[in-house]
Amino acid sequence: MAASFSVPSMIMEEEGRFEAEVAEVQTWWSSERFKLTRRPYTARDVVALRGHLKQGYASNEMAKKLWRTLKSHQANGTASRTFGALDPVQVTMMAKHLDTIYVSGWQCSSTHTSTNEPGPDLADYPYDTVPNKVEHLFFAQQYHDRKQREARMSMSREERTKTPFVDYLKPIIADGDTGFGGTTATVKLCKLFVERGAAGVHIEDQSSVTKKCGHMAGKVLVAVSEHINRLVAARLQFDVMGTETVLVARTDAVAATLIQSNIDARDHQFILGATNPSLRGKSLSSLLAEGMTVGKNGPALQSIEDQWLGSAGLMTFSEAVVQAIKRMNLNENEKNQRLSEWLTHARYENCLSNEQGRVLAAKLGVTDLFWDWDLPRTREGFYRFQGSVAAAVVRGWAFAQIADIIWMETASPDLNECTQFAEGIKSKTPEVMLAYNLSPSFNWDASGMTDQQMVEFIPRIARLGYCWQFITLAGFHADALVVDTFAKDYARRGMLAYVERIQREERTHGVDTLAHQKWSGANYYDRYLKTVQGGISSTAAMGKGVTEEQFKESWTRPGADGMGEGTSLVVAKSRM
Protein backbone atom coordinates (compact mmCIF):
# COMPACT_ATOMS: atom_id res chain seq x y z
CA MET A 1 0.00 0.00 0.00
CA ALA A 2 1.43 3.32 -1.07
CA ALA A 3 2.18 5.79 1.66
CA SER A 4 -0.16 8.79 1.78
CA PHE A 5 1.35 12.13 0.79
CA SER A 6 1.19 14.88 3.39
CA VAL A 7 1.20 18.37 1.86
CA PRO A 8 3.73 20.54 3.68
CA SER A 9 2.26 23.58 5.42
CA MET A 10 4.52 25.85 3.36
CA ILE A 11 2.88 24.59 0.16
CA MET A 12 -0.58 25.15 1.61
CA GLU A 13 0.36 28.68 2.63
CA GLU A 14 1.78 29.37 -0.83
CA GLU A 15 -1.44 28.21 -2.48
CA GLY A 16 -3.52 30.17 -0.01
CA ARG A 17 -1.67 33.40 -0.76
CA PHE A 18 -2.00 32.72 -4.49
CA GLU A 19 -5.75 32.11 -4.31
CA ALA A 20 -6.25 35.19 -2.14
CA GLU A 21 -4.46 37.32 -4.70
CA VAL A 22 -6.51 35.78 -7.52
CA ALA A 23 -9.66 36.76 -5.62
CA GLU A 24 -8.32 40.32 -5.21
CA VAL A 25 -7.73 40.62 -8.95
CA GLN A 26 -11.21 39.28 -9.74
CA THR A 27 -12.74 41.85 -7.39
CA TRP A 28 -10.62 44.60 -8.99
CA TRP A 29 -11.76 43.59 -12.47
CA SER A 30 -15.41 43.65 -11.42
CA SER A 31 -15.15 47.34 -10.47
CA GLU A 32 -16.76 50.14 -12.48
CA ARG A 33 -13.34 50.96 -13.95
CA PHE A 34 -13.25 47.78 -16.02
CA LYS A 35 -16.90 47.16 -16.78
CA LEU A 36 -16.30 47.49 -20.54
CA THR A 37 -13.04 45.52 -20.67
CA ARG A 38 -13.09 41.97 -22.06
CA ARG A 39 -9.95 40.01 -21.25
CA PRO A 40 -9.10 36.73 -23.03
CA TYR A 41 -7.16 35.56 -19.97
CA THR A 42 -7.95 34.87 -16.32
CA ALA A 43 -6.98 36.38 -12.99
CA ARG A 44 -5.00 33.21 -12.33
CA ASP A 45 -2.91 33.91 -15.45
CA VAL A 46 -2.14 37.39 -14.15
CA VAL A 47 -1.18 36.36 -10.63
CA ALA A 48 0.99 33.55 -11.96
CA LEU A 49 3.01 36.17 -13.87
CA ARG A 50 3.56 38.32 -10.78
CA GLY A 51 6.40 38.05 -8.32
CA HIS A 52 6.05 37.90 -4.55
CA LEU A 53 7.23 41.47 -3.93
CA LYS A 54 4.28 43.80 -4.34
CA GLN A 55 5.14 47.16 -5.84
CA GLY A 56 3.16 50.35 -6.07
CA TYR A 57 3.62 52.82 -8.94
CA ALA A 58 3.12 56.56 -8.83
CA SER A 59 1.86 56.35 -12.40
CA ASN A 60 -1.10 54.30 -11.17
CA GLU A 61 -2.33 57.24 -9.08
CA MET A 62 -2.01 59.40 -12.18
CA ALA A 63 -3.86 56.77 -14.24
CA LYS A 64 -6.78 56.86 -11.81
CA LYS A 65 -6.76 60.65 -11.97
CA LEU A 66 -6.73 60.52 -15.77
CA TRP A 67 -9.66 58.12 -15.80
CA ARG A 68 -11.71 60.38 -13.50
CA THR A 69 -10.83 63.42 -15.61
CA LEU A 70 -11.80 61.84 -18.92
CA LYS A 71 -14.98 60.20 -17.62
CA SER A 72 -16.06 63.57 -16.22
CA HIS A 73 -15.49 65.19 -19.61
CA GLN A 74 -17.35 62.36 -21.33
CA ALA A 75 -20.33 62.76 -19.01
CA ASN A 76 -20.39 66.53 -19.52
CA GLY A 77 -19.89 66.46 -23.30
CA THR A 78 -16.62 68.36 -22.93
CA ALA A 79 -13.01 67.49 -23.69
CA SER A 80 -9.62 67.48 -22.07
CA ARG A 81 -7.58 69.53 -24.52
CA THR A 82 -3.81 69.31 -24.48
CA PHE A 83 -0.72 69.17 -26.68
CA GLY A 84 2.68 67.54 -26.95
CA ALA A 85 5.11 68.82 -24.30
CA LEU A 86 8.81 69.06 -25.17
CA ASP A 87 10.44 69.76 -21.82
CA PRO A 88 9.94 70.66 -18.13
CA VAL A 89 9.40 74.34 -18.95
CA GLN A 90 6.48 73.53 -21.21
CA VAL A 91 4.98 70.94 -18.88
CA THR A 92 4.97 73.37 -15.93
CA MET A 93 3.43 76.16 -18.01
CA MET A 94 0.77 73.77 -19.35
CA ALA A 95 -0.13 72.69 -15.81
CA LYS A 96 -1.65 76.11 -15.10
CA HIS A 97 -4.20 75.82 -17.88
CA LEU A 98 -4.66 72.21 -19.06
CA ASP A 99 -5.67 68.99 -17.30
CA THR A 100 -3.62 66.39 -19.22
CA ILE A 101 -0.21 66.22 -20.89
CA TYR A 102 0.72 64.48 -24.15
CA VAL A 103 4.13 63.02 -25.05
CA SER A 104 4.57 62.67 -28.81
CA GLY A 105 6.73 60.05 -30.50
CA TRP A 106 7.21 62.46 -33.41
CA GLN A 107 8.61 65.13 -31.10
CA CYS A 108 10.87 62.61 -29.38
CA SER A 109 12.06 61.22 -32.71
CA SER A 110 12.98 64.68 -33.95
CA THR A 111 14.35 66.23 -30.76
CA HIS A 112 15.20 63.74 -28.00
CA THR A 113 15.98 60.09 -28.80
CA SER A 114 17.94 57.80 -26.50
CA THR A 115 20.84 57.85 -28.95
CA ASN A 116 20.54 61.62 -29.59
CA GLU A 117 20.19 60.80 -33.31
CA PRO A 118 17.23 62.82 -34.66
CA GLY A 119 15.01 61.77 -37.53
CA PRO A 120 11.43 61.65 -38.84
CA ASP A 121 8.63 59.75 -37.16
CA LEU A 122 9.35 56.23 -38.40
CA ALA A 123 9.47 54.63 -34.92
CA ASP A 124 13.03 53.53 -35.65
CA TYR A 125 14.44 55.09 -32.50
CA PRO A 126 15.27 52.94 -29.43
CA TYR A 127 12.10 51.80 -27.73
CA ASP A 128 13.00 53.48 -24.43
CA THR A 129 13.03 56.91 -26.12
CA VAL A 130 9.46 57.94 -25.30
CA PRO A 131 9.46 56.33 -21.82
CA ASN A 132 12.62 58.33 -21.09
CA LYS A 133 10.87 61.55 -22.07
CA VAL A 134 7.89 60.59 -19.92
CA GLU A 135 10.23 60.14 -16.95
CA HIS A 136 11.90 63.48 -17.74
CA LEU A 137 8.56 65.27 -17.58
CA PHE A 138 7.13 63.24 -14.70
CA PHE A 139 10.17 63.95 -12.54
CA ALA A 140 9.75 67.65 -13.38
CA GLN A 141 6.08 67.55 -12.41
CA GLN A 142 6.88 65.97 -9.06
CA TYR A 143 9.74 68.39 -8.44
CA HIS A 144 7.67 71.48 -9.10
CA ASP A 145 4.91 70.07 -6.92
CA ARG A 146 7.40 69.67 -4.04
CA LYS A 147 8.85 73.10 -4.70
CA GLN A 148 5.42 74.70 -4.63
CA ARG A 149 4.49 72.98 -1.39
CA GLU A 150 7.64 74.21 0.33
CA ALA A 151 6.99 77.73 -0.92
CA ARG A 152 3.35 77.74 0.18
CA MET A 153 4.13 76.35 3.62
CA SER A 154 6.59 79.22 4.04
CA MET A 155 3.76 81.73 3.50
CA SER A 156 1.20 83.04 5.91
CA ARG A 157 -2.41 81.94 5.47
CA GLU A 158 -3.21 85.33 4.00
CA GLU A 159 -0.42 85.00 1.45
CA ARG A 160 -1.54 81.50 0.49
CA THR A 161 -5.09 82.73 0.03
CA LYS A 162 -3.86 85.30 -2.49
CA THR A 163 -1.49 82.90 -4.26
CA PRO A 164 -3.05 80.55 -6.84
CA PHE A 165 -2.34 76.86 -6.30
CA VAL A 166 -1.11 75.05 -9.42
CA ASP A 167 -1.74 71.33 -9.82
CA TYR A 168 1.50 70.29 -11.49
CA LEU A 169 0.59 66.61 -11.37
CA LYS A 170 -1.33 66.41 -14.63
CA PRO A 171 -1.65 62.89 -16.09
CA ILE A 172 0.64 62.06 -19.00
CA ILE A 173 -0.55 60.10 -22.05
CA ALA A 174 2.36 58.78 -24.11
CA ASP A 175 2.93 57.56 -27.65
CA GLY A 176 3.59 53.80 -27.77
CA ASP A 177 3.72 53.78 -31.59
CA THR A 178 3.05 50.21 -32.79
CA GLY A 179 4.29 48.51 -29.64
CA PHE A 180 7.81 48.23 -31.08
CA GLY A 181 7.72 44.64 -32.29
CA GLY A 182 6.21 41.36 -31.15
CA THR A 183 4.25 40.57 -28.03
CA THR A 184 7.20 40.55 -25.65
CA ALA A 185 8.45 43.88 -27.01
CA THR A 186 5.04 45.45 -26.35
CA VAL A 187 4.96 43.95 -22.85
CA LYS A 188 8.38 45.39 -22.01
CA LEU A 189 7.54 48.78 -23.52
CA CYS A 190 4.38 49.02 -21.41
CA LYS A 191 6.33 48.02 -18.30
CA LEU A 192 8.72 50.89 -18.98
CA PHE A 193 5.85 53.34 -19.40
CA VAL A 194 4.34 52.37 -16.05
CA GLU A 195 7.70 52.62 -14.30
CA ARG A 196 8.52 55.98 -15.90
CA GLY A 197 5.24 57.70 -15.03
CA ALA A 198 2.76 57.36 -17.91
CA ALA A 199 -0.91 57.46 -16.93
CA GLY A 200 -1.97 56.38 -20.40
CA VAL A 201 -0.43 54.86 -23.53
CA HIS A 202 -1.64 54.73 -27.13
CA ILE A 203 -0.77 51.97 -29.58
CA GLU A 204 -1.57 52.08 -33.30
CA ASP A 205 -2.48 49.42 -35.86
CA GLN A 206 0.28 50.04 -38.38
CA SER A 207 2.97 47.50 -39.16
CA SER A 208 5.95 48.02 -36.87
CA VAL A 209 8.28 47.30 -39.82
CA THR A 210 6.89 50.04 -42.07
CA LYS A 211 5.52 52.45 -39.44
CA LYS A 212 4.97 56.02 -40.63
CA CYS A 213 3.75 59.22 -39.04
CA GLY A 214 -0.04 59.24 -39.24
CA HIS A 215 0.12 62.00 -41.85
CA MET A 216 2.67 60.39 -44.17
CA ALA A 217 1.95 58.17 -47.17
CA GLY A 218 2.80 54.47 -47.42
CA LYS A 219 1.04 53.28 -44.28
CA VAL A 220 0.61 49.52 -43.89
CA LEU A 221 -1.96 48.12 -41.48
CA VAL A 222 -1.69 44.88 -39.57
CA ALA A 223 -4.65 42.52 -39.39
CA VAL A 224 -7.31 43.37 -36.82
CA SER A 225 -6.38 40.26 -34.85
CA GLU A 226 -2.70 41.22 -34.71
CA HIS A 227 -3.46 44.62 -33.26
CA ILE A 228 -5.82 43.06 -30.75
CA ASN A 229 -2.87 40.92 -29.66
CA ARG A 230 -0.87 44.11 -29.07
CA LEU A 231 -3.65 45.62 -27.00
CA VAL A 232 -4.07 42.41 -25.01
CA ALA A 233 -0.31 42.34 -24.36
CA ALA A 234 -0.48 45.91 -23.06
CA ARG A 235 -3.52 45.25 -20.89
CA LEU A 236 -1.97 42.06 -19.52
CA GLN A 237 1.20 43.90 -18.53
CA PHE A 238 -0.79 46.61 -16.78
CA ASP A 239 -2.75 43.92 -14.93
CA VAL A 240 0.42 42.12 -13.90
CA MET A 241 1.74 45.40 -12.48
CA GLY A 242 -1.61 46.11 -10.82
CA THR A 243 -2.16 49.44 -12.59
CA GLU A 244 -5.17 51.07 -14.19
CA THR A 245 -3.14 52.62 -16.99
CA VAL A 246 -5.48 54.04 -19.63
CA LEU A 247 -5.08 52.22 -22.95
CA VAL A 248 -5.74 54.12 -26.18
CA ALA A 249 -6.15 52.20 -29.44
CA ARG A 250 -5.37 54.20 -32.56
CA THR A 251 -6.36 53.14 -36.05
CA ASP A 252 -4.87 54.47 -39.29
CA ALA A 253 -7.50 52.69 -41.38
CA VAL A 254 -8.87 55.87 -42.96
CA ALA A 255 -5.77 56.70 -45.01
CA ALA A 256 -3.96 53.35 -45.16
CA THR A 257 -3.51 51.87 -48.64
CA LEU A 258 -1.91 48.54 -47.73
CA ILE A 259 -2.38 45.72 -45.23
CA GLN A 260 0.07 43.02 -44.20
CA SER A 261 -2.22 40.02 -44.53
CA ASN A 262 -5.75 38.84 -45.27
CA ILE A 263 -5.90 36.44 -42.33
CA ASP A 264 -8.68 38.29 -40.48
CA ALA A 265 -12.17 38.13 -41.97
CA ARG A 266 -12.98 41.58 -40.58
CA ASP A 267 -10.50 43.04 -43.05
CA HIS A 268 -11.75 41.19 -46.13
CA GLN A 269 -14.37 43.68 -47.26
CA PHE A 270 -11.75 46.44 -47.53
CA ILE A 271 -9.09 44.52 -49.49
CA LEU A 272 -8.84 45.34 -53.19
CA GLY A 273 -8.65 42.75 -55.95
CA ALA A 274 -8.00 42.79 -59.70
CA THR A 275 -11.09 42.31 -61.90
CA ASN A 276 -9.42 42.22 -65.33
CA PRO A 277 -9.40 38.56 -66.47
CA SER A 278 -6.60 39.25 -68.96
CA LEU A 279 -4.22 39.64 -65.99
CA ARG A 280 -4.84 36.09 -64.80
CA GLY A 281 -1.45 34.60 -63.98
CA LYS A 282 0.31 37.97 -64.41
CA SER A 283 0.78 39.25 -60.88
CA LEU A 284 2.24 42.69 -60.35
CA SER A 285 5.04 41.36 -58.16
CA SER A 286 6.14 38.86 -60.81
CA LEU A 287 6.24 41.55 -63.51
CA LEU A 288 8.31 43.81 -61.26
CA ALA A 289 10.68 40.93 -60.50
CA GLU A 290 11.10 40.26 -64.21
CA GLY A 291 11.84 43.92 -64.80
CA MET A 292 14.52 43.92 -62.13
CA THR A 293 16.21 40.84 -63.59
CA VAL A 294 16.73 42.68 -66.89
CA GLY A 295 18.18 45.72 -65.16
CA LYS A 296 15.18 48.02 -64.88
CA ASN A 297 14.91 50.28 -61.86
CA GLY A 298 13.42 53.54 -60.60
CA PRO A 299 11.13 55.21 -63.15
CA ALA A 300 11.04 52.12 -65.37
CA LEU A 301 9.73 49.92 -62.57
CA GLN A 302 7.29 52.64 -61.52
CA SER A 303 6.00 52.74 -65.09
CA ILE A 304 5.39 48.97 -65.02
CA GLU A 305 3.47 49.28 -61.77
CA ASP A 306 1.42 52.27 -62.94
CA GLN A 307 0.43 50.54 -66.19
CA TRP A 308 -0.50 47.32 -64.41
CA LEU A 309 -2.58 49.07 -61.76
CA GLY A 310 -4.25 51.21 -64.40
CA SER A 311 -5.48 48.13 -66.24
CA ALA A 312 -6.30 45.93 -63.24
CA GLY A 313 -9.73 47.32 -62.43
CA LEU A 314 -9.03 47.33 -58.72
CA MET A 315 -12.07 47.25 -56.45
CA THR A 316 -13.39 45.53 -53.36
CA PHE A 317 -15.23 42.23 -53.70
CA SER A 318 -18.51 43.94 -52.85
CA GLU A 319 -18.00 46.53 -55.58
CA ALA A 320 -17.19 43.75 -58.05
CA VAL A 321 -20.40 41.89 -57.15
CA VAL A 322 -22.44 45.07 -57.64
CA GLN A 323 -20.91 45.54 -61.10
CA ALA A 324 -21.60 41.91 -61.98
CA ILE A 325 -25.27 42.16 -60.96
CA LYS A 326 -25.66 45.35 -63.01
CA ARG A 327 -24.32 43.50 -66.07
CA MET A 328 -26.83 40.64 -65.73
CA ASN A 329 -29.42 40.13 -68.44
CA LEU A 330 -32.34 40.75 -66.09
CA ASN A 331 -35.18 43.23 -65.92
CA GLU A 332 -34.59 46.27 -63.75
CA ASN A 333 -36.85 45.11 -60.91
CA GLU A 334 -34.99 41.81 -60.58
CA LYS A 335 -31.63 43.58 -60.74
CA ASN A 336 -32.68 46.04 -58.07
CA GLN A 337 -33.95 43.25 -55.82
CA ARG A 338 -30.66 41.38 -56.09
CA LEU A 339 -28.65 44.55 -55.58
CA SER A 340 -30.72 45.39 -52.52
CA GLU A 341 -30.24 41.91 -51.07
CA TRP A 342 -26.51 42.02 -51.69
CA LEU A 343 -26.02 45.52 -50.27
CA THR A 344 -28.11 44.65 -47.21
CA HIS A 345 -26.07 41.57 -46.38
CA ALA A 346 -22.74 43.11 -47.41
CA ARG A 347 -23.05 46.18 -45.20
CA TYR A 348 -19.77 46.89 -43.47
CA GLU A 349 -21.36 46.25 -40.08
CA ASN A 350 -21.82 42.57 -41.00
CA CYS A 351 -18.10 42.01 -41.67
CA LEU A 352 -18.68 39.34 -44.32
CA SER A 353 -15.62 37.22 -44.99
CA ASN A 354 -14.63 36.74 -48.62
CA GLU A 355 -15.79 33.12 -48.42
CA GLN A 356 -19.20 34.18 -47.07
CA GLY A 357 -19.42 36.85 -49.73
CA ARG A 358 -18.77 34.38 -52.53
CA VAL A 359 -21.47 32.03 -51.23
CA LEU A 360 -24.01 34.87 -51.08
CA ALA A 361 -22.96 36.18 -54.51
CA ALA A 362 -23.47 32.72 -56.01
CA LYS A 363 -27.00 32.56 -54.57
CA LEU A 364 -27.69 35.84 -56.36
CA GLY A 365 -26.43 34.43 -59.66
CA VAL A 366 -22.88 35.81 -59.61
CA THR A 367 -21.01 32.58 -60.30
CA ASP A 368 -18.29 33.49 -62.78
CA LEU A 369 -16.85 36.60 -61.15
CA PHE A 370 -13.15 37.20 -61.68
CA TRP A 371 -11.76 38.94 -58.61
CA ASP A 372 -8.26 38.21 -57.31
CA TRP A 373 -6.71 39.92 -54.29
CA ASP A 374 -3.32 38.22 -54.72
CA LEU A 375 -2.52 39.61 -58.18
CA PRO A 376 -2.11 43.27 -57.03
CA ARG A 377 0.10 42.47 -54.02
CA THR A 378 3.18 44.65 -53.68
CA ARG A 379 6.78 43.52 -54.01
CA GLU A 380 6.85 43.23 -50.22
CA GLY A 381 3.76 41.00 -50.27
CA PHE A 382 1.26 43.54 -48.92
CA TYR A 383 -2.36 43.51 -50.00
CA ARG A 384 -4.05 46.62 -51.42
CA PHE A 385 -6.44 48.20 -48.92
CA GLN A 386 -9.31 50.63 -49.39
CA GLY A 387 -9.06 52.93 -46.41
CA SER A 388 -12.26 54.51 -45.11
CA VAL A 389 -14.11 55.62 -42.02
CA ALA A 390 -16.07 52.37 -42.23
CA ALA A 391 -12.82 50.41 -41.97
CA ALA A 392 -11.86 52.50 -38.93
CA VAL A 393 -15.24 51.84 -37.31
CA VAL A 394 -14.95 48.07 -37.77
CA ARG A 395 -11.53 48.16 -36.15
CA GLY A 396 -12.75 50.44 -33.39
CA TRP A 397 -15.48 47.96 -32.44
CA ALA A 398 -12.90 45.20 -32.10
CA PHE A 399 -10.37 47.32 -30.22
CA ALA A 400 -12.97 48.66 -27.78
CA GLN A 401 -13.19 45.23 -26.15
CA ILE A 402 -9.69 45.76 -24.74
CA ALA A 403 -8.88 49.49 -24.99
CA ASP A 404 -10.42 52.37 -23.03
CA ILE A 405 -10.27 55.01 -25.76
CA ILE A 406 -10.50 54.75 -29.55
CA TRP A 407 -8.66 57.19 -31.81
CA MET A 408 -9.15 57.40 -35.57
CA GLU A 409 -6.30 59.19 -37.33
CA THR A 410 -7.59 61.48 -40.10
CA ALA A 411 -6.17 63.46 -42.99
CA SER A 412 -8.09 66.67 -42.30
CA PRO A 413 -10.33 68.23 -39.63
CA ASP A 414 -13.52 66.91 -41.23
CA LEU A 415 -16.60 67.26 -39.04
CA ASN A 416 -18.54 64.80 -41.19
CA GLU A 417 -15.84 62.16 -40.70
CA CYS A 418 -15.84 62.82 -36.97
CA THR A 419 -19.61 62.41 -36.85
CA GLN A 420 -19.62 59.27 -39.00
CA PHE A 421 -16.95 57.62 -36.87
CA ALA A 422 -18.53 58.58 -33.55
CA GLU A 423 -21.97 57.38 -34.59
CA GLY A 424 -20.53 54.17 -36.01
CA ILE A 425 -18.55 53.35 -32.88
CA LYS A 426 -21.42 54.18 -30.55
CA SER A 427 -23.86 52.00 -32.49
CA LYS A 428 -22.18 48.95 -30.91
CA THR A 429 -19.98 50.32 -28.12
CA PRO A 430 -21.86 53.40 -26.87
CA GLU A 431 -19.85 53.95 -23.67
CA VAL A 432 -16.34 53.87 -25.09
CA MET A 433 -14.40 57.15 -25.05
CA LEU A 434 -13.04 58.73 -28.23
CA ALA A 435 -9.87 60.72 -28.92
CA TYR A 436 -9.02 63.17 -31.71
CA ASN A 437 -5.71 64.45 -33.04
CA LEU A 438 -6.01 68.19 -33.74
CA SER A 439 -3.01 67.77 -35.94
CA PRO A 440 -0.63 70.56 -36.96
CA SER A 441 -0.15 68.51 -40.12
CA PHE A 442 -3.54 69.87 -41.19
CA ASN A 443 -3.50 73.22 -42.95
CA TRP A 444 -6.26 74.59 -40.77
CA ASP A 445 -6.56 77.79 -42.81
CA ALA A 446 -7.30 75.65 -45.89
CA SER A 447 -10.00 73.67 -44.07
CA GLY A 448 -12.75 76.09 -45.07
CA MET A 449 -13.52 76.96 -41.44
CA THR A 450 -14.07 80.47 -40.24
CA ASP A 451 -12.20 81.64 -37.14
CA GLN A 452 -15.37 81.13 -35.11
CA GLN A 453 -15.77 77.59 -36.43
CA MET A 454 -12.19 76.87 -35.35
CA VAL A 455 -13.05 78.15 -31.88
CA GLU A 456 -16.08 75.85 -31.83
CA PHE A 457 -14.37 72.76 -33.30
CA ILE A 458 -13.13 71.24 -30.02
CA PRO A 459 -16.40 71.66 -28.08
CA ARG A 460 -18.42 70.57 -31.09
CA ILE A 461 -16.73 67.20 -31.52
CA ALA A 462 -16.52 66.85 -27.73
CA ARG A 463 -20.30 66.61 -27.76
CA LEU A 464 -19.90 63.65 -30.15
CA GLY A 465 -17.83 61.83 -27.53
CA TYR A 466 -14.26 62.94 -28.32
CA CYS A 467 -13.38 63.62 -24.69
CA TRP A 468 -9.59 63.70 -25.18
CA GLN A 469 -8.28 66.06 -27.87
CA PHE A 470 -4.69 67.04 -28.47
CA ILE A 471 -2.33 68.89 -30.80
CA THR A 472 0.50 66.40 -31.12
CA LEU A 473 3.27 68.84 -32.00
CA ALA A 474 2.19 72.20 -30.59
CA GLY A 475 5.14 72.22 -28.18
CA PHE A 476 7.52 71.73 -31.09
CA HIS A 477 5.93 74.44 -33.24
CA ALA A 478 5.62 76.92 -30.37
CA ASP A 479 9.29 76.40 -29.51
CA ALA A 480 10.33 76.94 -33.13
CA LEU A 481 8.19 80.05 -33.59
CA VAL A 482 9.36 81.80 -30.43
CA VAL A 483 13.05 81.05 -30.97
CA ASP A 484 13.04 81.85 -34.69
CA THR A 485 11.32 85.21 -34.30
CA PHE A 486 13.37 86.14 -31.23
CA ALA A 487 16.69 85.14 -32.84
CA LYS A 488 15.89 87.26 -35.88
CA ASP A 489 14.99 90.29 -33.76
CA TYR A 490 17.92 89.77 -31.37
CA ALA A 491 20.36 89.75 -34.29
CA ARG A 492 18.96 93.14 -35.31
CA ARG A 493 18.15 94.95 -32.05
CA GLY A 494 20.25 93.21 -29.42
CA MET A 495 19.10 93.40 -25.81
CA LEU A 496 16.02 95.47 -26.56
CA ALA A 497 14.64 92.51 -28.48
CA TYR A 498 15.05 90.31 -25.40
CA VAL A 499 13.61 92.85 -23.01
CA GLU A 500 10.61 93.69 -25.20
CA ARG A 501 9.81 90.24 -26.51
CA ILE A 502 10.56 88.14 -23.45
CA GLN A 503 11.32 89.84 -20.14
CA ARG A 504 8.53 92.43 -20.25
CA GLU A 505 6.09 89.87 -21.66
CA GLU A 506 6.91 87.44 -18.84
CA ARG A 507 6.24 90.24 -16.37
CA THR A 508 3.01 91.32 -18.06
CA HIS A 509 1.58 87.80 -18.19
CA GLY A 510 2.86 86.66 -14.81
CA VAL A 511 5.04 83.91 -16.26
CA ASP A 512 7.03 82.47 -13.38
CA THR A 513 10.21 81.92 -15.40
CA LEU A 514 10.81 85.69 -15.11
CA ALA A 515 12.43 84.83 -11.78
CA HIS A 516 14.18 81.80 -13.21
CA GLN A 517 16.31 81.05 -10.13
CA LYS A 518 13.18 80.76 -8.06
CA TRP A 519 11.46 78.74 -10.81
CA SER A 520 14.37 76.29 -10.89
CA GLY A 521 14.03 75.71 -7.14
CA ALA A 522 16.92 77.64 -5.61
CA ASN A 523 14.72 78.55 -2.61
CA TYR A 524 13.71 74.91 -2.27
CA TYR A 525 17.28 73.69 -1.95
CA ASP A 526 18.18 76.59 0.32
CA ARG A 527 15.59 75.06 2.65
CA TYR A 528 17.56 71.80 2.53
CA LEU A 529 20.81 73.61 3.34
CA LYS A 530 19.30 75.51 6.23
CA THR A 531 17.53 72.43 7.59
CA VAL A 532 20.75 70.43 7.57
CA GLN A 533 22.74 73.29 9.13
CA GLY A 534 20.36 74.20 11.92
CA GLY A 535 18.35 76.88 10.15
CA ILE A 536 21.11 79.07 8.75
CA SER A 537 23.49 78.83 5.81
CA SER A 538 26.09 81.31 4.64
CA THR A 539 26.09 79.65 1.20
CA ALA A 540 22.36 79.84 0.46
CA ALA A 541 21.81 80.41 -3.26
CA MET A 542 19.08 83.00 -2.76
CA GLY A 543 20.91 84.94 -0.05
CA LYS A 544 22.33 88.44 -0.17
CA GLY A 545 23.76 89.24 -3.58
CA VAL A 546 21.41 87.20 -5.74
CA THR A 547 20.57 89.29 -8.81
CA GLU A 548 16.96 88.13 -8.81
CA GLU A 549 16.30 90.71 -6.05
CA GLN A 550 16.28 93.28 -8.87
CA PHE A 551 12.86 91.99 -9.89
CA LYS A 552 11.41 92.93 -6.50
CA GLU A 553 12.58 96.55 -6.55
CA SER A 554 11.32 99.83 -8.01
CA TRP A 555 13.36 101.50 -10.68
CA THR A 556 13.15 104.34 -13.16
CA ARG A 557 13.18 103.45 -16.84
CA PRO A 558 14.16 106.12 -19.40
CA GLY A 559 11.72 106.97 -22.17
CA ALA A 560 11.66 104.91 -25.31
CA ASP A 561 14.12 107.26 -27.05
CA GLY A 562 16.49 107.26 -24.07
CA MET A 563 16.05 111.02 -23.62
CA GLY A 564 12.52 111.50 -22.30
CA GLU A 565 11.01 111.47 -18.85
CA GLY A 566 11.49 108.24 -16.93
CA THR A 567 8.62 106.02 -15.95
CA SER A 568 8.57 104.62 -12.43
CA LEU A 569 7.66 100.92 -12.45
CA VAL A 570 7.22 98.55 -9.55
CA VAL A 571 7.79 94.95 -10.54
CA ALA A 572 5.46 92.52 -8.83
CA LYS A 573 6.87 89.33 -7.39
CA SER A 574 6.72 86.60 -9.97
CA ARG A 575 4.27 83.76 -9.48
CA MET A 576 5.48 80.47 -8.10
Swiss-Prot record:
Binding site for Mg(2+): 175
Organism: Arabidopsis thaliana (Mouse-ear cress)
Top enzyme class: lyase
Pathway: Carbohydrate metabolism; glyoxylate cycle; (S)-malate from isocitrate: step 1/2
Pfam families referenced in this protein's UniProt entry, alphabetically: ICL
MF terms (GO), sorted A to Z: isocitrate lyase activity; metal ion binding
Protein name in UniProt: Isocitrate lyase
Chain's gene name: ICL
Phenotype reported upon loss of the gene: No visible phenotype under normal growth conditions, but mutant seedlings fail to establish into plantlets with true leaves under low light or short day conditions.
Short motif (Microbody targeting signal): ranges: 574-576
